[in-house]
Amino acid sequence: MAKHRRVFEYLHGGIESGALKPGDRLPSEAELGRLFDASRITVAKAVLDLQRMGLVTRRPGAGTHVLSQQRATGRTFGLLIPELGLTEIFEPICLGMARTGFAKPDALLWGSASASAGESAREAEQMAQSFIAQKAAGVFFAPLELAADRDAVNRRIARALDRAQIPIVLLDRCYMPFPERSDHDLVGIDNRRAGYMAAAHLLGMGARRLAFLGEPAAANTVDARIAGFHEAMRMHGAAPERDPAWRGSAQDEVLVRGMLEALRPEGIVCANDLTAAQLMQTLLGLGVRIPEQVRIVGIDDVKYASLLPVPLTTIHQDCAGIGVAAMAAMLERLEHPELPARDILLPVRLVVRRSCGAQLKSRSGDERGLAWE
């Protein structure tokens, strides 16, 4: 057993058994270090785990003390995710929250709106009011994305929760336009890096003319991905004269044909896997061969990405890990409301499948170090 885990089990066992009572001061980090022959960093990691579970609190200059059970248990958190069920990433994020040890003393109230965009906006505001009425300890909020009045609705929801003094942790995206920032913690991925990685991979495959395609009313995560896409083009000396980032439906055959004629792209980065799947169907319907004529990369790595007509190369995000990090952020926010707003960004990784044309390079002996799936 790792040393920090031994320290954690020792302290956690003392709290659970009652040997360490509410208000009791934990042994100092120096004392615990001597007891377990562990460094102060190792001890601090164990204490931080207890703090994230809401079992202890740090008092500057006074040490770490056990919280009362009334404060440590029985809290209710709201999940305000209007597009739960419509966007695949949110279900594993929520499951990550529910399964983490940090959440065991607490309850999660699931709220979703799976109707039309307009109805989803109304239902989202109603859910926020419901969480306020139930005196939720905190709310995990994934801002509306595709509704026409999404900006106004998202701001009204945030203001209502702020007035009720209910902490908010944003999931996946901010409700402010990129690169602006709200006053709330956000847990997601580094979207700029994801866009950069997707474009850089296609450039590394030999494609020089690239395009980017995303929905016109998408979340600000898409703006960040476009920024990363542009950066990769500049860094690789492939920046075109005209903007290669297009906004529109990947199912619009006229738009897709226009993009092909205007840009003659050898590779296309899609804002997400859903857009990539729709684009793939449209291109195949137009007689375009993938990846021989056009290479495609998505972002998300949803379940069906490997099952598409041409298995999709994509950027994988750790959705369960986002859920765990979001719960930890909420508990820390409750303990330290004075902390500045933070972006907690989990790493992403490239998953190589057929749509990027890597197998074409493999046949010619040019493939180096690719992580195939």
Per-range role (PLM):
Residues 6, 10, 14, 184, ...:
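Flexible loop/turn connectors
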Residues 7, 174-177, 181-212, 250-257, ...:
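Hydrophobic alpha-helical segments within soluble ligand-binding/sensing domains
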Residues 9-13, 17, 31, 35, ...:
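Alpha-helical recognition/docking segments in bacterial nutrient-uptake
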Residues 19-58:
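N-terminal helix-turn-helix
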Residues 25-28, 58-72:
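Short, Lys/Arg-rich nucleic-acid/phosphate-binding segment
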Residues 88-104, 194-197, 220-239, 278, ...:
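Short, solvent-exposed amphipathic alpha-helices that sit
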Residues 101-118, 212, 230-250:
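Short beta-strand elements in bilobed, periplasmic/extracellular small-molecule ligand-binding domains
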Residues 196-238, 342-356:
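An alpha-beta-alpha
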